[in-house]
Amino acid sequence: MDVEQAIPLLRIFSVEKAREFYLDYLGFVVDWEHRFDSTAPLYMQVSRAGLVLHLTEHHGDCCPGSTVFVRATGLLDFHAELHSRDYPYLRPGIEHAPWGADTLELTDPFGNRLRFNEYGGATGG
């Protein structure tokens, strides 16, 4: 078996809040959206810099409060980009984690966490 890609599913409860957080604040783009009909829950794929996420309003797809562990580079630039945006609900910092990575953790409006990790030093740690 060869694994091509793992795509986390994250539960959302408001399309408006999800768009504000993932698109406007984090800079993801919508790759596609799906609804079974005009009143059905939304299922959409968003991506940025190789990170692909599926955001779902569907009950039973997944539980809120998940954590996605992301290995990345350019954490300092990403941190500066986030702080340049007018998003009043988060002002994340970068911390050196016990597992040896510099870490920037974000919690979305639905309790899901994105934990961005840079090994070898965003902050020289």
Where are these regions (language model features)?
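Conserved beta-strand-loop-alpha-helix junction that forms the acyl-donor binding cleft
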Residues: 11-15, 36-39, 98
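Vicinal oxygen chelate
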Residues: 15-16, 68-113
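N-terminal beta-strand motif that seeds the catalytic metal site of vicinal oxygen chelate
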Residues: 1-19, 31, 66-68, 118-125
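Conserved acetyl-CoA-binding loop of GNAT-fold acetyltransferases
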Residues: 24-30, 87-88
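Conserved short beta-strand elements that form part of the metal-binding/catalytic scaffold
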Residues: 31-65, 113-118
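Conserved beta-strand segments that form the floor/walls of ligand-binding pockets within enzyme
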Residues: 7, 11, 54, 105, ...
